[in-house]
From Swiss-Prot:
Compartment(s): Secreted
Identification of the protein by name: Probable endopolygalacturonase E
Keyword Signal (UniProt): yes
Claim: Acetylation is one of the keywords in the record: no
InterPro entries: Glyco_hydro_28, Glycosyl_hydrlase_28, PbH1, Pectin_lyas_fold, Pectin_lyase_fold/virulence
The organism's place on the tree of life at top rank: Eukaryota
Family stated for the protein in its record: Belongs to the glycosyl hydrolase 28 family.
């Protein structure tokens, strides 16, 4: 039974509700179909047309799979200016046609990019086609392998590179780049024909982290030419010229700061720990640390600092300072024909060095060191 009072209450409540303002519902614009496709699309490219197709379609794919791609001669596998968040996956064997040119064979750039190698995948440079014993100093023009330029907050991992014609990774203009579990195998060039096959050349970059690298080559395992906040750890360097700062000088940016090499092995190489600066130039090297570094079968110098790297016939100059240079637990062996430690500094350019638990033996003791900092033995 409905009483008259109940009817009155219900009528009043309905009137109040109808009189109250009601907020418009929030309307979220529907994403465009093309944007959804870009976010979700996985594209696979293969064969002799794979490189060209990938370069043309790269901004339409959130994941780019490169499966047994055969890059034509004189052509870069161009993966520059990728969409943010793109994932690149190498599968199978990636090959490159022969031509005398400067390269690069591969180039990647962008923000929040991930580059990975699938199990068993490798990039085969087949460098013997170019090797002539002269590297980048003459003979055939040889392509550099992999440009990691202008990468931000990105990761390259699990990449296996075999027989690069000349320098392998060029890292330039990048920041917050992590490289993990990279293998560079240029052992086929150990017969003397391969040269200047640097593993990682770093310039004008910040916050670069390289972990777990295995580098078998014929030049610097790592060469930091300029940049700040660079960290290399858990690496194995074999057959090359060691873990190097420089050469510093001769560029628009000649500053190296806050570099750490940690928990790594250098074996069967010309040099172990190395800093090289250019005669007569200006710049600075500071806050460089080598910690827990093991040397074995070093042929030339266990530890070497040269401030006349480009012309050893001249006296070292002090335009490029080397300050706060730390060695902590650097130990190992040099061959009897080599030299344990060799330091050639400018008159006032090498300061605030701290060496602890340094034991490099087996080679000769140099009598030609110059301007060795206080408390450091040459």
């Amino acid at each position: 039974m409905v009483t008259s009072s109940s009817v009155i209450v219900l009528t009043l409540w309905a009137a109040l509700v109808s009189a109250s303002p009601v907020a418009d519902p929030l309307v979220t614009p529907a994403p465009k179909l093309e944007d959804l496709e870009k976010r979700a699309t996985s594209c696979t490219f293969s064969g002799s047309e794979g490189a060209s197709s990938a370069s043309k379609s790269k901004t339409s794919c959130s994941t780019i799979v490169l499966s047994d791609v055969a890059v034509p001669s004189g052509t870069t596998l161009d993966l520059t200016d990728l969409n943010d968040g793109t994932h690149v996956i190498f599968e199978g064997e990636t090959t490159f046609g022969y031509e005398e040119w400067s390269g690069p064979l591969v180039s990647v750039s962008g923000t929040d990019i991930t580059v990975t190698g699938a199990d068993g995948a490798y990039l085969n440079g087949d460098g013997s086609r170019w090797w002539d014993g002269e590297g980048s100093n003459g003979g055939k023009t040889k392509p550099k392998f992999f440009y990691a330029h202008d990468l931000t907050s990105s990761t390259i991992s699990g990449i296996y590179i075999q027989n690069s014609p000349v320098q392998v990774f060029s890292i330039d203009g990048s920041t917050y780049l992590t490289m993990e579990d990279i293998t560079i195998d240029n052992t086929d060039g150990d017969d003397g024909e391969a040269a200047n096959t640097d593993g990682f050349d770093i310039g004008d970059s910040t916050y670069i982290t390289i972990t777990g690298a295995n580098v078998y080559n014929q030049d610097d395992c790592v060469a930091v030419n300029s940049g700040e906040n660079i960290y290399f750890s858990g690496g194995v360097c074999s057959g090359g010229h060691g873990l190097s700062i420089g050469s510093v000088g001769g560029r628009s940016d000649n500053t190296v700061k806050n570099v750490t090499f940690y928990d790594s092995e250098i074996k069967s190489s010309q040099n172990g720990v190395r800093i090289k600066t250019i005669y007569g130039d200006t710049g600075s090297v500071s806050e460089v640390t080598y910690k827990e570094i093991t040397l074995s079968d070093i042929t030339d110098y266990g530890i070497v600092v040269e401030q006349n790297y480009d012309d050893t016939s001249k006296s070292p100059t002090d335009g490029i300072t080397i300050e706060d240079f730390v060695l902590d637990n650097v130990q190992g062996s040099v061959e009897s024909s080599g030299t344990n430690i060799y330091i050639v500094c400018g008159s006032d350019s090498c300061t605030d060095w701290t060496w602890t638990d340094v034991d490099v033996s087996g080679g000769k003791t140099s009598s030609d060191c110059e301007n060795v900092p206080d408390d450091i033995s040459c």
